Amino acid sequence: MNRPMKLFGVAVAAIMAVESVAVASTDGHRLETAKWQAAIDAASAAGGGVVEIPAGDHPTGMLRLKSNVELRLQEGARLVASGDPADYKPVKMHGSTEFRAVVAGVSVTNVAVTGKGEIFGNAWAFDYARRSQPKPSGVLFIDCRMVRLDDFTLRDAAGWGVDIKKCEDMVIRRVKVDSHAGVCTDGIDIEGRNILIEDCDVDSGDDAICVKSHDVGYPVENIVVRGCSARSHCNAFKIGTATHGVIRNVSFVHCRAFAARRVYRDLAPMPKDLLNSRPVKGAPWYLCGPGFGCINVECVDGGLVENIVVDDIEMEGYRSPIFIRGGDRRGFNDSHADTSQGRWFTLRNVVVSNVRGKADGRTPSTVTGAGRCRPCNIVLKDIDLEIPGEGENRKPYSWPGDDKAGAYPQTTLFDSYHLPAYGLFVDKADGVRMDNVKFRLRSGTTDSRPAICEK
């Protein structure tokens, strides 16, 4: 018998395994949405159960999980997403915002997606030249409790891979995400409370593992990312960019980050083979260059980001190892602010320690503020990074001021500037402390800048 576990001190009941609801497989070429949805509904109505997807391809539109149901993908099973947006009934959040996914749960409790099978998002069937066309996520949970995601593979989602919104008491373990349809194909995006992400392997075209806050009134807190591997063309481990409310008590520990394995060169001519998980002959693959940032902690939308721990990170293949940014993007509603409590436009209490590896770009790590947000109480400890020197560059030093407070917060912000350090640049930040921080020039390279510059 499974025992309840405790996650962040909150008791989380283990999902109860009862009699499976058996569903016969079809030929794998016509949509099976209605059949699988009926099985899910029947299991929930019976008080709970396990719906098993057998080996083989199973084309489907959007499936809605119900309370007390586990969707189990047997080894060799593949849910193949329909390429027709009409097969995804939108889920509304915040009144009008619509979301779609291959597998979704909305306001349900005690649910799971498990097994050694695969969810194939069929991204190439969607028209990326039409940005207005809906792009369904792979897995979506909104306003749910006691959710477990274990062991399955999610490949080539049209939108975000795993999208978690306002969920609590959740475990994501040993999930593999391999998704490279282009921009906005994040691996795992989290907005919730009491969540553990452990031993996952994420390879994504956009940000790999990301914690966000869209709702001023909903604190995002108590999130642990542990033992994960991240590959990204953009950013590996990230808090932001959406930072409208509170994000607190988040840790990334014992993780590795490397550059993404693959990405598409052109988002327009997509192969449209419903059942083929690999691009058709002639599809424009190419190996991408380094990712943008490995460790990214941001507060740019007027929120509060605090008590962040990043520890024991091995990295290679990113232009900027550490990017900590306070900003002031347009669109913040000042009527929401509670400046008397020091809550808004605040980025504080961040500890980054035991980071080692090799950078793959000439933009240094940065701790910077702009506009109404200055990072405060930032600790960098036991950091050992190899940096490729830029040589004897006589270009005058320059860096962005408050005129860039609303710029998109990632290391590309500094591309048109010549920062005055090759290892770490600190500007408009308070209480930045360093202990045993080493930036070593790569063998055979030089750099006329100092390793560290604090303004």
Task: List each language-model region with its residue ranges.
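Extracellular/periplasmic carbohydrate-active domains that bind, remodel
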Residues: S20-K455
